[in-house]
Amino acid sequence: MLLFLACCLAPLALGAQEEPEVITGKADAGRHLYYSAPLGTNGLSCVHCHTDFDEAAQDDGLIRAGHSLYGAASRPNWWGREPEQANAYANIGAAAAVCVEHFQRNPQRLTAQQLVDLRAYLRFINRKQQRQSLALTSGADRTGEYLGFDEGDRIKGRELFYATCHSCHPNARSGIGPALPSDREPAYYAKKVREGDGLGAQIAGLDPNAYDPSSGQFMPYFSVDRLSNRN
């Protein structure tokens, strides 16, 4: 009799165990995170570097270091890591967490809820799907000299400054980023634009150790397809 009761009650006991909670992401909460500077520790938000609209159809007057994330959720990979690689990102939310940790200087990255919320928003803006990989490129000068930037149009340069630099270096003063010196050679500024915090130099194969996450630097680099050498 005791054995019979044990057999009958065992399934009930197992059924009484709590099911693991499934976290559901909300696109509206993810959009809030996308525009939220407090998500990081330095004032940067996702939208500082990536638009959430189709840049070919819309223009807000800014030139960002990163490509638009409109439709990016359907890319086959992110950060140049192929799906079969051991360190590949499972989805765009996991790839975005890298930016939160490094560029936004948040060592805690994202909570599980924030991660699924942000992923939900990036999937929500996936109307124009991108089925091809986005190559991770850099326009860093392989010689490291950055020659040929001595001449330029000052008026055009002013317009470009406000489109690309002003949000982090307001009127060349300190803001999210440090104040910009006005007495350096053109090569100095060109190197900063192309290499950023060192990631641009590493991707170009100039220096495998140029990108150091522990350095405290977080300036993104501008590749040639974001800002041409002429600009």
Annotate each PLM feature.
Residues 104-107, 175-177, 198-213:
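Substrate-binding/catalytic groove segments of enzymes
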